[in-house]
Amino acid sequence: MKFIDEARIEVIAGDGGDGSASMRREKFVPFGGPDGGDGGRGGSVYVIADRNINTLIDYRYAKKHMARNGENGRGSDCYGKGGDDVTLRMPVGTVINDMDTGELIADLTEHDQKVLVAKGGAGGLGNLHFKSSTNRAPRQKTDGKPGERRMLKLELKVLADVGLLGMPNAGKSTFISSVSNAKPKIADYPFTTLAPNLGVVRVGPGKSFVIADIPGLIEGAAEGAGLGHQFLRHLQRTGLLLHLVDLAPFDESVDPVAEAKAIVGELRKYDESLYQKPRWLVLNKLDMVPEDERRTRVVDFIERFGWTGPVFEISALTGQGCEGLVYAIYDYLAEHSDAHRAELAEDLASDVRFRDASGAGGEPHEREADAP
């Protein structure tokens, strides 16, 4: 199935039915009085988070979703039937914004989370409500209220604990397939990965975390070059980023340090908060480096890159070093999970406050110095 992570739809709630201005007319009841019923309420539009859905493709082509109107009231104090509600099922991780006002309507973070996005109109009142001691035969009634109508922007931000960064062919897909249950397409050409892949890494009974692989970044990605920029939003919810570097590129003219610096630069240009996330350096493809050159090449890379954070040396293909990295990730996430959840909640609250005022991850990673 094609991966779609953005869509625009229109949701239209049903109008309320009109009240009835009816009089009771029966044999032997000369002054029956008013008996007009109320109109039914209009149907509302809800969204529900569903963990079994992983793309917004259903909403790329079905752009209008309408609930039914309420029925009009009738005589004999018969109320109109309420309109049926419409329920839209969306992936967990979907962010819903009102395109006209910029209001953040919902952030679907839990399975079965239900949110009202367009409220149906109230039904009108029948003339029975207007009966009084001085008005025994009222002819007044009210019309139903119109339902809400909204243009919504849907954005899917996958929910993962760990995100993978790196140039195309850095070995990200090989790594995620080696340590998790994900089975991404793997080949020796750039941009084999065209959509985010999620994998569950199981460390032990009841111990696991989710890792996300996005298409590789290239220089200029923040301005739209390549594929990775359109998927960087999927890393915004992660608690840890792994920066994978190909330490043994096939093209000897390629400088891994220059590529790594380009990735960091693109990350910073795209989103400063994403740049500030905890980030570990993972030097991959050590199996392609002669054993007597490995230490020299690793030390040279770290010095030229100016990196002072955690460093892991692995071979995703052979599995060398992967187990230690996985356990280190799990321990880190277990230690910082509460802080990361608090940060996500604060980010969401800040976003809401900002939008209201305008009308329209994890603890900070301390580094003495960072790569430029």
Swiss-Prot record:
Domain OBG-type G: residue ranges: 160-334
Gene Ontology BP terms: ribosome biogenesis
Region listing for Disordered, in residue ranges: 128-147
Cofactor(s) this protein requires: Mg(2+)
Record keywords, A-Z: Cytoplasm, GTP-binding, Hydrolase, Magnesium, Metal-binding, Nucleotide-binding
Domain of life according to the entry: Bacteria
Top-level EC class: hydrolase
Pfam family, one: GTP1_OBG
Binding site for GTP: 166-173, 191-195, 213-216, 284-287, 315-317
Metal-binding listed as a keyword: yes
Subcellular localization: Cytoplasm
The keyword Coiled coil is annotated on this UniProt entry: no
Major location (coarse): cytoplasm
Alphabetized GO MF terms: GTP binding; GTPase activity; magnesium ion binding
Annotated EC: 3.6.5.-
Chain's role: An essential GTPase which binds GTP, GDP and possibly (p)ppGpp with moderate affinity, with high nucleotide exchange rates and a fairly low GTP hydrolysis rate. Plays a role in control of the cell cycle, stress response, ribosome biogenesis and in those bacteria that undergo differentiation, in morphogenesis control.
Family of the protein in this entry: Belongs to the TRAFAC class OBG-HflX-like GTPase superfamily. OBG GTPase family.
NCBIfam families registered for this protein in UniProt: Obg_CgtA, PRK12296.1, PRK12297.1, PRK12299.1
Protein's UniProt name: GTPase Obg
